Regions:
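A short beta-strand-turn-helix
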Residues: 226-247
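Aromatic-flanked redox-active Cys/Sec active sites in thiol-based oxidoreductases
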Residues: 250-256
């Protein structure tokens, strides 16, 4: 723990967590949150998080550092429109895009045949409830982020309570309405009362709920590092992986349910773009160990483990994670003092897209709310359009 952390920890333990029977003082002292904001007027991300925790936040979207640590990309709608909207009509046609048809289809999220501002709107956070998400969590019985045919059929059997062999519209509406009850075997859900303030403060300073550092900014050089692969056979240096293709850098850990839930999306991205981009994951500190902010949703799928105390223990957990999620790209294990995860602000989960020159072209928001594979894919597609040579036109 650095000096800043120790200072804040002292403030917290000497004020907020004082015993209830402490005799009243004649003059009220300033609240810890007021002291923090006065001491750090620039209000860095970790201060925003600590202040909100002290004020009773349960770390929902838009609270703490989540309102500051939003995604950054070169490929905003304004930047993309300025580059590709040749006729100035406020949209980008297939002809104006002049790239791969499959890439255009990926960017055209509303399937209207044009690229427009709504296609670039990823403002809903990654855990925003939807019928599709509810169906996914109901089906993903083992919590590995992928729904198998057997799991999908299991949902049908569970919902067909009358044994009629079919489901009605109302059956599905009741099961997967955002306001109605539905089965959630693997969905991320804290205890009904929520974590205590002390649990959240410990999680903050242990860097379990996130790094105290903000990480590199857009267009900055990606900090170099060298880590061992999860099997211990190779040492991989980031700078050796940079160029000629874009590099997708993934941070995550096993006890982060939202990270696990995105495993299928991550694997599909890798399968689709593995010939055009390099994928590397860094395994970081556990977000929800049993000796920290434990989650009942982890218990339901058998992901129960304490925070690793040694590098070897972290490697063992990382191997379980890779085996369960079945990732087919290099997975590196961060040092036990979180040297890479802290520098990149990678805990509990985060994406970076690094261009062939080694600079950050896209940086996701902090996980879990900012951990959006589809948003990453959009920036990847547009970076590929810039970095790949155009296909030669076919002569008639």
């Amino acid at each position: 723990m650095n000096r800043t952390s120790l200072f804040c920890f002292a403030i917290l333990t000497s004020t907020t967590l004082a015993f209830a029977d402490e005799p009243a003082r004649p003059a009220p002292k300033p609240k810890p949150s007021e002291i923090l904001e006065k001491t750090w007027p620039d209000h860095p991300e970790w201060v925003a998080m600590l202040v909100d925790i002290l004020q009773g936040s349960q770390l929902g979207p838009g609270e703490g550092w989540f309102k500051k640590a939003v995604s950054q990309t070169r490929f905003t709608w304004d930047a993309t429109r300025k580059e590709l909207d040749k006729d100035g009509d406020g949209s980008i046609s297939k002809a104006e895009f002049a790239g791969k048809a499959a890439d255009f289809a990926t960017l055209d999220r509303d399937r209207d045949g044009l690229l427009t501002a709504p296609d670039f709107d990823f403002s809903p956070h990654a855990l925003t409830p939807s019928p599709g998400m509810m169906l996914f969590y109901a089906a993903d019985r083992d919590g590995n982020g992928k729904v198998s045919r057997e799991e999908f059929e299991g949902v049908f059997r569970a919902l067909d309570s009358g044994g009629l062999g079919f489901l009605s519209q109302d059956d599905l509406r009741r099961a997967f309405s955002p306001s109605g009850p539905r089965p959630r075997p693997s969905s991320p859900s804290p205890a009904a009362s929520g974590p205590s303030k002390w649990t959240l403060v410990k999680g903050l300073f242990r860097q379990e709920i996130g790094s105290l550092q903000p990480g590199p900014k857009l267009d900055e050089a990606a900090p170099d590092f060298a880590l061992l692969t999860v099997d211990g056979k190779d040492a991989l240096m980031l700078s050796k992986k940079v160029g000629p293709k874009p590099l997708v850098l993934i941070f995550g850990n096993f006890t982060c349910g939202p990270f696990r839930s995105q495993a299928g999306n991550i694997e599909k991205l890798h399968e689709h773009y593995k010939d055009r981009a390099t994928f590397v994951m860094v395994y970081v500190r556990e977000a929800h160990p049993t000796d920290g902010w434990a989650m009942e949703s982890n218990n339901r799928v058998g992901v129960t483990l304490r925070q690793p105390r040694t590098y070897d223990e972290r490697v063992e957990v990382a191997r379980k994670c890779v085996k369960t999620l079945d990732f087919d790209f290099p997975v590196l294990v961060d040092s036990i003092n979180d040297s890479v995860g802290a520098r990149y602000s990678g805990m509990p989960g985060r994406f970076y897209l690094i261009d062939p020159e080694g600079k950050v072209a896209y940086k996701s928001g902090r996980g879990p709310f900012g951990f959006k594979p589809a948003e990453l894919e959009q920036s990847l597609v547009l970076l590929l359009k810039q970095s790949e040579k155009p296909e030669p036109s076919k002569k008639p």
